[in-house]
C-alpha cells in the first residue's frame, strides 16, 4: 500500500511540476510555428496570384518590385552573411518585431483562417519573448513602448493591388522570421547539426 501511495505521489508531482522547457525545445516549437505560418503565407499568396489574369499578375509584380513593405523600416540583415554574423539576441529581436508588426494586419489576409493566423502569430510572439528573456544576458530587450502596428491603409478592401502587396509582404516577412529563428536555433543548439 505504501508503494502505491509513493507511486501516486511521484506521478502527481510529475504532473504538477513538469520539467522546465529547454531553449532547444522552445526554439524547435518556434521554428515549427514559423514554418507553418510561412507555408500559409506562401499558399495564400500563390492562391491569390493564380486567381488573377496573367497580365494582372505581371503588372502587380512589377508594381510590387518598385514598392516596399511597411516592415522594411525594421532594420534587419541584408544578406546571408550578415544574418550569420548577427547575434542570437539581434535575430530574436528582429523576429519579435516582425511578428508583432503582423498581429493586426494578419486579420485582413485572405486565403486562410485569419483567426488561426492571428493566434499563431500571438503564440509565436510569446515564444520569441521567452527565448529573448532566456538569452538576454542582463541586457534590456527593448522598451515595452516599442510596440507598433504596420500602417496598411485600407485593410480588408477588395483592391487586388493592396491585397497582393499585403500577401507578398506577409510572405516575405514570414520567410525572414523563419530564416532568423533557424539560424539562432542552429547557433544555440550544436546537436541540431545545421548547415546554413
Swiss-Prot record:
The record's listing under Pfam families reads: Hormone_1
Q: Which residues form the signal peptide?
A: 1-18
Q: Does the keyword Secreted apply?
A: yes
Residue positions binding Zn(2+)? 35, 178
> Which InterPro entries does its entry note?
4_helix_cytokine-like_core (IPR009079), Somatotropin (IPR034975), Somatotropin/Prolactin (IPR001400), Somatotropin_CS (IPR018116)
Select a single GO molecular function from the record's annotations and give it. Answer: metal ion binding
Q: Which UniProt keywords apply?
A: Disulfide bond, Hormone, Metal-binding, Pyrrolidone carboxylic acid, Secreted, Signal, Zinc
Can you tell me which residues the record assigns to a coiled coil?
A: none
Presence of the UniProt keyword Disulfide bond in the record: yes
| Name of the encoding gene | gh
Q: Which SUPFAM superfamilies match?
A: 4-helical cytokines (SSF47266)
A GO cellular component term found in this entry reads: extracellular space
Q: Which cysteines are joined by disulfide bonds?
A: 69-169, 186-194
Q: Which family does it belong to?
A: Belongs to the somatotropin/prolactin family.
- The PTM Pyrrolidone carboxylic acid maps to 19
Q: What is this protein called?
A: Somatotropin
Give the UniProt record's GO annotations in the biological process aspect.
animal organ development; growth hormone receptor signaling pathway; positive regulation of growth; positive regulation of receptor signaling pathway via JAK-STAT; response to nutrient levels
Amino acid at each position: 500500500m505504501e508503494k502505491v501511495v509513493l507511486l501516486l505521489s511521484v506521478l502527481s508531482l510529475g504532473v504538477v511540476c513538469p520539467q522546465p522547457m529547454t531553449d532547444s525545445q522552445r526554439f524547435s516549437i518556434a521554428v515549427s510555428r514559423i514554418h507553418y505560418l510561412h507555408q500559409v503565407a506562401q499558399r495564400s499568396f500563390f492562391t491569390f496570384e493564380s486567381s488573377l489574369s496573367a497580365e494582372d499578375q505581371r503588372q502587380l509584380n512589377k508594381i510590387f518590385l518598385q514598392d516596399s513593405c511597411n516592415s522594411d523600416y525594421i532594420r534587419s540583415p541584408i544578406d546571408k552573411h550578415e544574418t550569420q554574423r548577427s547575434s542570437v539576441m539581434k535575430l530574436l529581436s528582429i523576429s519579435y518585431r516582425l511578428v508583432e508588426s503582423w498581429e493586426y494586419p494578419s486579420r485582413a489576409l485572405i486565403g486562410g483562417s485569419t483567426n488561426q493566423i492571428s493566434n499563431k502569430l500571438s503564440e509565436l510572439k510569446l515564444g520569441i519573448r521567452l527565448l529573448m528573456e532566456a538569452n538576454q544576458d542582463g541586457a534590456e530587450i527593448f522598451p515595452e513602448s516599442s510596440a507598433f502596428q504596420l500602417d496598411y491603409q485600407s485593410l480588408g478592401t477588395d483592391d487586388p493591388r493592396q491585397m497582393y502587396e499585403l500577401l507578398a509582404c506577409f510572405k516575405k516577412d514570414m520567410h525572414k522570421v523563419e530564416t532568423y529563428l533557424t539560424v539562432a536555433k542552429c547557433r544555440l543548439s550544436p546537436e541540431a547539426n545545421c548547415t546554413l
